[in-house]
């Protein structure tokens, strides 16, 4: 587990505060971007391991390494063994080798899924300070680095531990799609030498005469985001239909139980009036097995992904609307 220390003189004591900030070395950001550029294609997801340490309530990510791309046919590949060998090699060259989380690329903001939930729960259950970094290459390609850190909320961690994803379980935990993930602020830190080099390169960069401030973003981004949003809404609608079918089956079964109980009572009254022995009471639940309640976690995840798409569309449209108003004002001859 990542070491969590609090500097008090020359002693280190265990701190119980949660991770409130993520500090990432610039080299780690470049390695994540490079990993996607080399192995990511379209909607294909790339993943990797984050290494670092925890100081007070700050998680410092100092290194990372990628998961190699492999298919189901690669039966000889052992992912756990690969991670252990990589961390052992890093330890031999005196590089931070403490496991503090993982990273994953996303396609138009698509990352809220059961696979990510299960993976992050496994990481966070084993290593309390773990985070997952979500890198969006589409937004980054438009000139704005998109890298966010997420953790599962304590509420969702408890639900995953109990493994009760029924409607009653989620209601008891008082959890909604807004309560699944918590975003942790990110700070990108470079060494002084890298900052000096970046300053020198910026001075040497040629000055372009083109002003791209008012250029509108590609409409393909909005079109694709809306298409993905509609697909998730359709999935949520189908999931709601399945749950409503389950509720109807429950109601129908309750009516059948009630009718069976009434018939048995009437039959026993008739037998008693004829002086015959009453029929024994039977366990109604054995005769009418209740239908298996569907998991509501998938609906929760779909709702969370819908919310993510909406936030991306809102951000995209607000930026373009601002550019449109600025362009209109600049064309006004009275100004």
UniProtKB/Swiss-Prot annotation:
Keyword Signal tagged: no
> Keywords assigned by UniProt?
Cytoplasm, Initiation factor, Protein biosynthesis
Q: Which GO terms describe its molecular function?
A: metallopeptidase activity; translation initiation factor activity
Q: Which GO terms describe its biological process?
A: formation of cytoplasmic translation initiation complex; translational initiation
Q: Name one GO cellular component term.
A: eukaryotic translation initiation factor 3 complex
Disulfide cross-links: none
Q: Name one Pfam family in it.
A: eIF3h_C
Q: Where in the cell is it found?
A: Cytoplasm
Q: Which residues form the MPN domain?
A: 22-156
- Bias category Polar residues: which stretches? 267-276
Q: Which InterPro entries match?
A: eIF3h, eIF3h_C, JAMM/MPN+_dom, JAMM_MPN+_peptidase_M67A, MPN
Q: Where is the composition biased (Low complexity)?
A: 254-263
Q: Please indicate if the UniProt record lists Protein biosynthesis as a keyword.
A: yes
Q: Where is this region: Disordered?
A: 254-287
Instruction: Give the similarity note.
Output: Belongs to the eIF-3 subunit H family.
Subunit structure comment from the entry = Component of the eukaryotic translation initiation factor 3 (eIF-3) complex, which is composed of 13 subunits: eif3a, eif3b, eif3c, eif3d, eif3e, eif3f, eif3g, eif3h, eif3i, eif3j, eif3k, eif3l and eif3m.
* HAMAP family associated with the record: eIF3h (MF_03007)
Q: What does the UniProt record say this protein does? A: Component of the eukaryotic translation initiation factor 3 (eIF-3) complex, which is involved in protein synthesis of a specialized repertoire of mRNAs and, together with other initiation factors, stimulates binding of mRNA and methionyl-tRNAi to the 40S ribosome. The eIF-3 complex specifically targets and initiates translation of a subset of mRNAs involved in cell proliferation.
Q: What is this protein called?
A: Eukaryotic translation initiation factor 3 subunit H
Q: Which organism is it from?
A: Xenopus tropicalis
Which lineage do the record's taxonomy fields give for this organism? Eukaryota, Metazoa, Chordata, Craniata, Vertebrata
